[in-house]
Regions:
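Phosphate-binding loop of NTP-binding sites
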Residues: 4-165
Length: 165
């Protein structure tokens, strides 16, 4: 049953992404939201199919640029990479990146994954997969409206890293 759910979730994510693009929207997070509703384990299942390593990029500034540079460097070596290029870096966006890179049979043929993750979303994303490497660009106080003090952001990252134990 879980394989069937994964296949349906992948199809739904791809169809949602396509429909949003033809109507002039990105639709990345909506595609991920729908995929997770159909198969709550889709991120765990697809990320487990990455052959080599999973890189996660976090930080206040420069996440998208750093993540996309890392992805480009790996692709230049002829490797297949799952990447959330658009910076959709919360749970739905990350799920969409994996689902939209999967085949219609619900399988992922990727050597690496380069995933940008919002600092506060690490605690929601890391239970689904454990990255092999984390690139932390920086932590600044420019998002006080979202996270309060920088210590709160740092504690969120520490809590997320407890999943490694």
């Amino acid at each position: 049953m879980s394989r069937l759910r994964r296949i349906i979730a992948v199809w739904a994510a791809k169809a949602t992404g396509f429909a949003c693009r033809i109507t002039g929207k990105q639709g990345v997070t909506l595609a991920g939201q729908i995929a997770l509703k159909i198969d709550p384990d889709i991120l765990k299942e697809l990320s487990g199919q990455v052959k080599e390593k999973i890189f996660v990029t976090c930080g206040t500034n420069g996440k998208t640029t750093t993540n996309n540079l890392l992805c480009s460097a790996i692709e230049a070596e002829g490797k297949k990479v799952v990447c959330n290029h658009t910076g959709s870096n919360m749970l739905n966006g990350v799920a969409a990146a994996f689902a939209q890179n999967a085949s219609l049979s619900g399988n992922l043929k990727a050597d690496y994954a380069c995933i940008e993750v919002d600092e506060a979303s690490t605690v929601r994303i890391f239970p689904h997969f454990k990255p092999d490497y984390m690139v932390l660009t920086n932590l600044f106080r420019d998002q006080l409206d979202r996270y309060g003090e920088i210590d709160i952001t740092m504690n969120l990252l520490k809590k997320a890293m407890e999943w490694y134990r």
